[in-house]
Design a protein with these regions (language model features):
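Short, flexible loop/hinge motifs at secondary-structure junctions
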Residues: 1-182, 224-225, 253-254, 260, ...
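Catalytic center-proximal scaffold of phosphoryl-transfer enzymes
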Residues: 1-3, 23, 125, 162-164, ...
Length: 530
């Protein structure tokens, strides 16, 4: 009904009808207000999505929180003052004036005994330019530069001498040693270089082929792949040993990353996305292992069938929000506070920059998590025992966790569940038990960053080759990533370790395979990082 018609009807109505008309108009207004609020919420949600995808494509990847200085008085003054006081403590006081600590000027570690080539620069003319008398040498200034010798190859020729008895004509020849790649010119150092370049430096095989061609050596990509595959066959017993050990560890970190295998198709005939799983022993475990494991898809069974805890003791697995980790028999899930924080950072990044209640709420959660991390950093700096860390966490961090989850329950009723902030709140609230679980044992970590970073190593390499041709190639790439990154986890020089491993593995019994692991007493000192 139009305004004019309503006015005419209202003017001609008696008192009872006027009240009914007004009541009807008020009900219509309420409905329109509800509709406007609903549309406004939808617009806010769509704007959040737009800002989220803009930030995803064009924004910075850092999760550092940029706080609006105009909002500091609301919730962040204490944190700011503490940060300033920390910075002030780092300023050195030297003889009446202050200066910031300088960064190290040493390009080379002092204990790195690099060879030094001395080049002396002397004057040819030793006559004084002022009086003409002969100059006397009184010392010298030094300029140092770090130089690199371009990679060189050489051929090592083994000669096995033959002997004959002049009396009885008996022929004798020196026995040949057992080598990993018989009847070929491919040495452990060459194959070790293939492996190191691909699985530590993420250098694709076709680029390795090009680099050898530049040195005048005709090594095809297919030959590189063939010999890396042969190395995998030799190394498999050690890989299986790592698998056995990591399944026995009482604390494990886990993560996963995508991998396309060309020969694996889905029902529509498209290349199926499979997953590489990454498992890492905890820092407290006596054998540091980084284990990559390929299996078809992201099904729960890929994780639940790998880990089987048949003992009575409690075991823990650090992981992100993927539900499969919750279903591993005999393992308790320890959720990741870095993931929880990331959800609030994402919510903050899609909000308008002007001060608002939502920004305040979001920053409060980020600051509370920041307080937890501040304590964790202090524990590491103090180098306290795991038992002491558990005690201090219960005293210092538990009250912060109580406040964090209490606020989540309060704010969950105030924000839209489908908004970024709503999703961040729900993410942490539904994982309260597993987010608190790190308080149970001082060996547990507040987050799963260690496994995440290792999964990213595989993802970085994947960008250079995108996919594997077949499942066997995916399995072997996981084997090599495991060998390389387990060496790194044990503070070994990965290339030197791989060469040493290939040199010795052909003469080692499978029953003694752990003697070649990075924690073995047989590891030479020269392949250990200083």
């Amino acid at each position: 009904m139009k305004k004019e018609e309503i006015l005419i009807k209202f003017n001609n109505a008696d008192e009872e009808e006027k009240r009914n008309i007004l009541l009807s108009l008020l009900l219509d207004l309420d409905k329109k207000d509800d509709k406007i609020n609903e549309q406004k919420s939808n617009i806010d949600h769509l704007n959040e999505l737009i800002n989220y995808y803009k930030n995803l494509i064009f924004g910075k990847k850092s999760e550092k929180n940029k706080v609006n200085p105009n909002q500091l008085s609301l919730f962040n003054e204490l944190e700011t003052e503490e940060t300033i006081s920390e910075l002030e403590q780092k300023i050195e006081e030297i003889k009446g004036y202050k200066r910031r600590p300088k960064g190290s000027k040493n390009l080379v570690n002092e204990d790195n005994n690099l060879p030094v080539e001395i080049i002396e620069h002397r004057r040819d003319d030793l006559s004084c330019p002022t009086c003409g008398n002969e100059l006397k040498e009184i010392g010298y200034d030094v300029r140092k530069e770090l130089c690199v010798i371009p990679e060189k190859c050489f051929i090592k020729e083994h000669r096995y001498f033959k002997y004959a008895c002049p009396t009885c004509s008996k022929m004798v020849q020196e026995e040949r040693e057992v080598i990993p790649f018989p009847n070929s010119m491919y040495s452990p150092s060459l194959v070790g270089k293939f492996i190191y370049d691909k699985f530590a430096l993420s250098l694709p095989f076709y680029r390795q082929e090009q680099s050898y061609r530049d040195l005048g050596i005709n090594i095809s990509r297919n030959n590189i792949i063939n010999y890396v595959s042969k190395a995998c066959d030799l190394i498999r017993p050690l890989y299986d040993k790592y698998s056995e050990i990591i399944k026995s560890a009482d604390i494990v970190h886990g993560d996963e990353t995508r991998l396309k295998v060309l020969s694996e198709k889905n029902e529509e005939g498209n290349v199926k996305t499979n997953y590489v799983w990454l498992f890492r022993t905890s820092q407290s475990f006596n054998k540091q292992i980084t284990f990559y494991y390929y299996n078809d898809g992201r099904k729960y069974s890929n994780v639940t069938s790998f880990f089987k805890n048949e003992t009575e003791e409690a075991r823990y697995i650090h992981a992100d929000g993927y539900e499969a980790y919750e279903h591993i028999k005999g393992y308790k899930l320890v959720s990741c506070f870095a993931h929880a924080r990331r959800k609030f950072v994402e919510a903050l990044n899609v909000m308008p920059s002007s001060p608002s209640k939502k920004r305040q709420i979001c920053n409060e959660y980020i600051n509370l998590i920041g307080k937890l991390y501040k304590f964790e950093k202090q524990y590491k700096e103090d180098k306290i025992s795991y038992e002491k860390r558990k005690e201090r966490r219960l005293i210092e961090e538990k009250p912060i966790l109580d406040e964090f989850f209490s606020n989540l329950k309060r704010d969950s009723l105030k924000v839209l569940p489908e908004s970024k902030l709503g999703k961040a709140i729900i993410y942490s609230l539904t994982r309260e038990e597993s987010l608190r679980r790190y308080l149970e044992d001082g060996r547990l970590e507040i987050d799963n960053n260690m496994a995440e970073h290792l999964a990213k190593n595989y993802a970085v390499g994947r960008k250079n080759w995108l996919f594997c041709d077949n499942p066997n190639g995916a399995v072997k790439s996981c084997m090599m990533y495991t060998i390389v990154h387990t060496a790194i986890a044990n503070n070994l020089k990965p290339e030197d370790y791989i060469i040493w491993l290939l040199d010795n593995i052909a003469t080692t019994n499978v029953s003694d395979i752990e003697s070649l692991a990075p924690w073995s007493s047989l590891i030479p000192d020269e392949i250990k990082r200083k």
